[in-house]
């Protein structure tokens, strides 16, 4: 049995419950969300000036 410590990813969620799916598009379904395997890349999207007014948060997702 192999233990994989990287069995999670990060998704970007706004204050209204929508997930970032790429190219400035948002959707309610987590399965469509763009997933990031590094918190560094997720933070880059979160801090993007285009999305300041959306009140973004980073969500840790089990995969």
Where would I find each of the regions flagged by the language model?
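Short aromatic-glycine-(Arg/Gly/Cys) micro-motifs in beta-strand/loop hairpins
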Residues: 5-32
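Cysteine-patterned extracellular/luminal domains and small secreted cysteine-rich peptides
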Residues: 3-4, 21, 49-52
């Amino acid at each position: 049995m192999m233990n994989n410590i990287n069995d999670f990813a990060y998704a970007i969620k706004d204050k209204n419950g929508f997930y970032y799916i790429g190219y400035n598009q948002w959707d309610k379904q987590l399965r469509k969300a763009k997933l990031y395997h590094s918190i560094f890349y997720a933070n880059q999207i979160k801090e993007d000036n285009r999305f300041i007014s959306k009140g973004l948060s980073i969500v840790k997702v089990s995969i």
